[in-house]
Amino acid sequence: MAELACFCYPHLENDSYKFIPFNNLAIKCMLTAKVDRKDQDKFYNSIIYGIAPPPQFKKRYNTNDNSRGMNYETSMFNKVAVLICEALNSIKVTQSDVANVLSRVVSVRHLENLVLRRENHQDVLFHSKELLLKSVLIAIGHSKEIETTATAEGGEIVFQNAAFTMWKLTYLEHKLMPILDQNFIEYKITVNEDKPISESHVKELIAELRWQYNKFAVITHGKGHYRVVKYSSVANHADRVYATFKSNNKNGNVLEFNLLDQRIIWQNWYAFTSSMKQGNTLDICKKLLFQKMKRESNPFKGLSTDRKMDEVSQIGI
């Protein structure tokens, strides 16, 4: 995760702003600079290489002292920064909006995936600039539309029906902020269209999840799509979701947290996010993740549980 101010800076033209991507030499200069505390939140002028991000965001970049940040010296950083600028320059951002826009925390991996989709000649985003920009504006939280299959970050499709598409995420192969844990495995489910979904299509998805992904929890980050994650990583997701929710509220980026379909979401996660929306502390909310929940009656009585052992997934074992 990183703020948009880590990728670009605003330049006033007439009554609105144009956004310009940082170059990696300017960032490198900022990372070595001694800056007064009162200037930590201001864009840094490297003199030689142009404007750099505010020094308060130093920890967002990978250095000898911080291996958890972005690999800003890769070509992928420049591609992501350019893509963000293209999207921001397609809309009007005024002086009253610019600080709010640049403070938005975005998923770096999501944006890298959109770059990969853009470069794939077989992908619809390669052929449609309008759909590409729409996808980016959704990813950076500017659009109130949800991420559907056409505007999704992408990955490897492992399941699809008339209503849903399930993607295996490819973060292990990323350049900008790869996941280093080789045991990482995670999926995302997007709706094909933002419209009411028939019970039969929900039933098909639940059957697929029950038999092929029975070692995983289905959760949501509140953005209109589902995530299918290992139970061992649920607490980590909870910390991130709670921190983002609080940060957005603090910065005035109040986005509706979408709880999604309770029949699909893991019961404990639904309880956690509901408690979070009510304003409870992180500790109170997280207790619900480890609490034994009363099993609800099967919402789909026709969904058979009669399967042979060799049909049950071994994924995640």
Curated annotation (Swiss-Prot):
Binding-site residues for ATP, renumbered to this chain: S107, V108, R109, K188, H221, G222, K223, R227
One Pfam family recorded for the sequence: Rota_NS35_C
Protein source organism: Rotavirus A (strain RVA/Cow/United Kingdom/UK/1975/G6P7[5]) (RV-A)
Protein name, entry field: Non-structural protein 2
Keyword Lyase assigned: no
Active-site residues, as the UniProt record annotates them: H225
Family classification: Belongs to the rotavirus NSP2 family.
Subcellular location: Host cytoplasm
Function: Participates in replication and packaging of the viral genome. Plays a crucial role, together with NSP5, in the formation of virus factories (viroplasms), which are large inclusions in the host cytoplasm where replication intermediates are assembled and viral RNA replication takes place. Displays ssRNA binding, NTPase, RNA triphosphatase (RTPase) and ATP-independent helix-unwinding activities. The unwinding activity may prepare and organize plus-strand RNAs for packaging and replication by removing interfering secondary structures.
Segments for region (RNA-binding): 205-241
Cofactor: Mg(2+)
Assembly behavior: Homooctamer. Interacts with VP1; this interaction is weak. Interacts with NSP5; this interaction leads to up-regulation of NSP5 phosphorylation and formation of viral factories. Interacts with host DCP1A, DCP1B, DDX6, EDC4 and EIF2S1/eIF2-alpha; these interactions are probably part of the sequestration of some host SGs and PBs proteins in viral factories.
Database matches in InterPro entries: Rota_NS35_C, Rota_NS35_N, Rotavirus_NSP2, Rotavirus_NSP2_C, Rotavirus_NSP2_N
GO annotation (BP), single: viral genome replication
Keywords: ATP-binding, Host cytoplasm, Hydrolase, Magnesium, Metal-binding, Nucleotide-binding, RNA-binding
EC assignment: 3.6.4.-
GO CC annotation terms, alphabetical: host cell cytoplasm
One Gene Ontology molecular-function label: ATP binding
Chief location of this protein within or outside the cell: host cell
Region forming the signal peptide: none
Tree of life domain: Viruses
Enzyme class, broadest EC rank: hydrolase
